[in-house]
């Protein structure tokens, strides 16, 4: 543990006379607790860095809540009653399994991941054909192939302040089971007053959220795009997707569909190819999950704003 810490953060935290190595995912929470930030912190020597944090922690107000995992500090969170609310990770998934099995026919666990700062699980909601019935009809009305699709739901949580308990409606599409994100998640933040009862209430919103999300995806079929490459580049840049990812997605889109006019729906599926590329490259589950949420934000942008002609240097 010590050797690993020396190679990563190089920091230990002293708490009530005991010393705990600091994990990578804890650094931002410590900086937040100390109320400091800035790129310059990354450039100073490690002993100077530690001294700055120590001086700021001395004047930090309130209590702190530590998350310890496998001998290391994974997070330093607000410990006052109005700050961070603990939502037990095991209970989150137990409640989710119970609700999904009771309310969705043919619910099947597909997989998940656990990392030091995040855990996630994915379930297929097979047997709920009505969830996709309207979407399939829209696809056929627009001469699109209503290929094999499965409604799925992802539930993600963190006990290090990385995220709240989030419920994501999603699709698996085609033979490869490509992931298609369906908009913003149902969120429960780890704020004062958050409880498992609140999470149970959010679980009851899944069906309605799915119907709304599917309508949002269907709306993209009605948005004609005259300049798909510029539009795709503009959207992905607006979302903050890295140049490497967006260039690879655009090149794949050009190879498959060319540069002829299409719909926003076609481009959205093209952008979603980034998720498959990341999975093939062996990206961590948390990185893929974050990218799913990033791509989903495209459902709420003004696509016409990015449908511009000309040879634009991106």
Regions found by a protein language model. Name each.
Residues 1-95:
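Feature for intrinsically disordered/low-complexity regulatory segments and propeptides
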Residues 77-78, 84-314:
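Intrinsic disorder/low-complexity polar-acidic segments
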């Amino acid at each position: 543990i010590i050797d690993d810490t020396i190679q990563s953060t190089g920091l230990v935290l002293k708490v009530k006379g005991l010393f705990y190595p600091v994990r990578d995912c804890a650094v931002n929470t410590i900086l937040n607790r100390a109320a400091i930030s800035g790129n310059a912190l990354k450039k100073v020597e490690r002993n100077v860095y530690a001294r700055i944090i120590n001086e700021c922690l001395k004047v930090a107000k309130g209590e702190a809540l530590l998350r310890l995992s496998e001998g290391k500090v994974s997070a330093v969170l607000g410990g006052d009653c109005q700050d961070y609310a603990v939502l037990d990770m095991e209970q989150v998934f137990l409640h989710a399994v119970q609700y999904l099995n009771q309310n969705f026919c043919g619910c099947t666990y597909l997989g998940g991941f656990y990392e030091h700062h995040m855990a996630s699980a994915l379930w297929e909601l097979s047997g709920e054909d009505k969830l996709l019935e309207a979407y399939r009809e829209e696809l056929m009305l627009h001469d699109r192939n209503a290929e094999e699709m499965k409604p799925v739901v992802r539930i993600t949580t963190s006990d290090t302040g990385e995220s709240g308990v989030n419920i994501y409606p999603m699709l698996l599409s085609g033979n490869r089971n490509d992931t298609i994100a369906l908009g913003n998640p149902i969120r429960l933040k780890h704020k004062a007053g958050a409880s498992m009862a609140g999470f149970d209430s959010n679980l009851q919103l899944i069906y309605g959220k799915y119907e709304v999300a599917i309508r949002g995806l269907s709306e993209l079929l009605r948005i004609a795009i005259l300049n798909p490459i510029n539009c795709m580049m503009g959207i992905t840049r607006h979302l903050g997707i890295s140049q490497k990812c967006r260039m690879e997605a655009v090149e794949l889109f050009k190879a498959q569909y060319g540069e002829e006019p299409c719909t926003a729906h076609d481009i959205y599926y093209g952008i979603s190819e980034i998720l498959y590329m990341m999975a093939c490259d062996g990206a961590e589950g948390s990185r893929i999950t974050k990218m799913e949420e990033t791509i989903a934000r495209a459902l709420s942008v003004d696509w016409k704003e990015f449908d511009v002609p000309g040879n634009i240097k991106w």
